[in-house]
Amino acid sequence: MLDLITFLFGEVRTATGISTNQSKAYKINDVTSGIIKFKNNIQGSIQLSFNGSENRDEMVIVCSNGTLKFSLMTNDNLTVIKDDKTYEISFEDIEHVQMPYIKRIVDTLLGKDDFDTTGIYGLRTQELIETFDNSTTIEY
């Protein structure tokens, strides 16, 4: 999810997180709140709860002229809400979900693409996860 957020909104300028073991069911944090400010001045908040009574998988992006809602883990419809109207957009399942990623890597190795292979995006995602989980702040 955090990698998708940075893909959609760009590089992070600063992020702050608060996590706690609210349920005490396991020895691990199960509730996390995060605030992110991106280098392009977009701001957002994240709320994750792994102990709720409801199993809900939804990302909501509220923009100045509409709202997007979609699942992170399923291929459910994307919902667009604009001007008090709701639209549903569906996507067909692809047979091999990893294939576009693998193709870009192969094409990069063959010199036909410039897919980033430095691992910096994975590192930035891991830094955000640790920032939220450790209830700290990170700045770039």
How would you label these PLM feature ranges?
Residues 1-2, 98-106, 129-130:
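A general structural signal for well-ordered alpha-helical segments in protein cores
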Residues 1-43, 49-54, 120:
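Rossmann-like dinucleotide-binding domain that binds NAD(P)(H)
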Residues 59, 75-83:
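Short polybasic amphipathic segments
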Residues 66-71:
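Broad, structure-driven detector of short, well-ordered beta-strand segments within folded domains
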Residues 87-92, 138-140:
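Generic detection of short hydrophobic beta-strand segments and adjacent strand-loop junctions
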